[in-house]
Amino acid sequence: MEGFLLNEQTWLQHLKEKRLAYGLSQNRLAVATGITRQYLSDIETGKVKPSEDLQQSLWEALERFNPDAPLEMLFDYVRIRFPTTDVQQVVENILQLKLSYFLHEDYGFYSYSEHYALGDIFVLCSHELDKGVLVELKGRGCRQFESYLLAQQRSWYEFFMDVLVAGGVMKRLDLAINDKTGILNIPVLTEKCQQEECISVFRSFKSYRSGELVRKEEKECMGNTLYIGSLQSEVYFCIYEKDYEQYKKNDIPIEDAEVKNRFEIRLKNERAYYAVRDLLVYDNPEHTAFKIINRYIRFVDKDDSKPRSDWKLNEEWAWFIGNNRERLKLTTKPEPY
């Protein structure tokens, strides 16, 4: 932890300065750490010396209130079908891009006969009205489309409103929650699934561990992924170690990765539509994302003296879903094509 590298006086000064910079009262930080306000006051004035464990707890609690937000949400997969065969109308009126900028190919996917591509933005078309025009944006496609939205001075909300007004049918929507502080311990969550400490309407989960048989600082470099729910259903969750993915794809050292873990809410068809509608009605990503998560799962701590339904909510999970942290924000990360 950052504070452990500093001498005691500097550590205390740094703690207080950071708390004030984050706009936090002593009481709010104390409650989040599980101590009294008076005890925190005594720590800051040097009257008592906190243990190393308490120092670590204070830093972790403090970072949860980081104005830069320990959690952020992105759109990471968007697939929409339009009930028309007029591809130009979809591209120029809905995407608000020039069809002439797209590369045309006389083959398609998902039984479509042809497609247009601009970087990772795909528009599939068919002469059959029941297929219509399909717009597909995977992860990179979403980031590239955000560059165009920025130039158009439009937001995702305005785009989705245009989609629904035009009769667009949501086929898939992935909401990605980036965990920048490593609060989601995926091996622990996997173990909780195995120990029946995941209370869920889902009936299945799958976990994978992949990696290289190399050692970095005496540790195997591995990545963990946890799927909760059936991959064939209209809603399921995928939780994985994003830092390991970035190491594998881009050779970014794991310790330097901006995002530690990612929690993906994967929605299809009607579930995707209701999520978009909820976002447009409430303009509150926190409300939309965690309403879905809380509807389907919660992680608890086993207590053999109580019925399973009365087991206490796991503390780290409670923080993830909203206890004592700043509100989740919808962010964009525009990337040029």
Predicted regions and their residues:
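Short alpha-helical DNA-recognition segment
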Residues: 23-42
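Alpha-helix N-cap/N′ positions at the starts of helices
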Residues: 10-11, 35
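Short, conserved catalytic or interaction motifs in soluble domains
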Residues: 45
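The alpha-helix within a helix-turn-helix
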Residues: 19, 30, 59
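Structured, helix-rich domain cores that form ligand/interaction pockets
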Residues: 1-10, 17, 21, 64-335
